[in-house]
Amino acid sequence: MKKHYETDLDYKKRLIDRISPTYCGAKWYNATIWLGSGRTTSCHHPPAHNVTVKEVVVNFKRLHNTEQKKDDRRKMLAGERPAGCDYCWRIEDMGTDKVSDRVYKTMAYSDEDNLLAAQTPIDDDVDLRTLEIAFDRTCQFACSYCNPAFSTTWVKDIKVKGPYKDLTTDGRGHFTHIHEHDQLYDFHETNPYVEAFFAWWDDSLHRTLKELRITGGEPLMSGHTWKLIDWFKTNKDKSNTELAINSNLGFDLSLVNRLLDSTEGIKLSVYTSNESMFGQAEYIRDGLEWTQWLTNVTYLLESKRLKNLNIMCTINALCLDSLPEFLDLVAGLKRTYGWQSLYISLNIMRFPSFQGPLVLPEHLRQHYKNRLVEWHEKNKDEKLFGEFELNHLERLIDYLDIVKTPHSEGFELASHQRDFKSFYEQYDVRRGKDFRKTFSPIMLEWYESI
């Protein structure tokens, strides 16, 4: 963990570089696991990979300790860069003073745990300290940058209206089929991955985990989420694990109150998503009602029942149009409820690439970069945002200015720009939206030129 007098960069030099120039504690101690599909990864940046049913039936710790992760651990300790961690390498390659997410991921664990990881034999199974799980993909939203792998509303869209057409750069097929492999079991069927998780939870996870974070889909729509919450209520003396919920907060206050009432006496953090304002937010995050979302955010802050509330911003091309105003909103909430009551992260979207910020032409990237620079200069001295938050903003500014390709896969700008327009033209028809009435004149001028 970072010492109180250290900067993020100081911490990296003192601890991480001492272990290895490419070490990341998340590869040992963190996992995101999609139990509906039997897929796992060490954080939200590397592509997920499969875990077989046979593996988890024999050893439930294989939900995390896969051969691929063990090979990545070996590479990191040898100073090599695992290919799946390309997001962090691209941030760091912008300059030696740039802090990537692997620093923040590692910082979540004690110095002792990180040094122990370096000494643990590669073939050993490691106990998790932080875990994010998704039980299924049930979700009432169908955000533009999401897909059927993570949303049943997206599944319905593809089933009813068919695949999106003529997207030449979507090599991963985000929008062409219903991704049946991402929900292998119906809700009434026994899911061996869910059973393996609960077996591991009962055996040792409830003791080794610092934080359990439930995501989705929308996790408050899953019965398994409420089963876990009930476990916490009746076993408060058995676990020090803190509970966190990822939620789009797209529901009325009765469900918010159910969550608060069900977790009374439990350390709870809520992570919600948004990155733009008003109609632009409703356009990007289809299913969101702006007023409802903001009402729920304010209600949670006023309740003073949470450890903290976190807003995760998925930085895509469209949200840049009103991101400074969204940051103003967050600053206002911090002034009202205290700067530590609310945190924000700016997570740069890379897939689908044709929706990412680098699809924009140079003049628009510079325009949005300059607006963010202006916002940063105006607000940096008010002390409303922590070092982590300001670093996220500064690296986004640098990313818009310096980085030209979002990942190591092919990126031909003109083709991605054509797909940008093709997708949103179809999106408007399918979702009853209107790009031209939603975004700013400078964005629209470029859009019409494609």
Residue positions per predicted region:
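Radical SAM enzyme [4Fe-4S]-AdoMet core and its adjacent flexible, acidic
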Residues: M1-H64, T96-M107, V155-I158, S262-I266, ...
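Cysteine/selenocysteine-centered motifs that mediate thiol-based redox chemistry or coordinate metal-sulfur cofactors
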Residues: K2-Y5, N59-N114, V126
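Short linear interaction motifs
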Residues: T7-T22, E112-R129
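Short metal-coordination and nucleic-acid-contact micro-motifs, chiefly zinc-binding Cys/His arrays
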Residues: S20, R81-G84, E132-F135, C139
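N-terminal pre-triad scaffold of radical SAM enzymes
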Residues: G25, Y29-S42, P121-A149, L209-R213
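A Trp-anchored, charged/polar loop motif used as the substrate-binding/catalytic surface
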Residues: K70, E112-I122, E189-D203, L253
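Detector for the c-type heme attachment site
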Residues: W89-D93, C146-T152
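Core AdoMet radical
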Residues: L128-T138, A149-Y193, R207-T225, N235-L255, ...
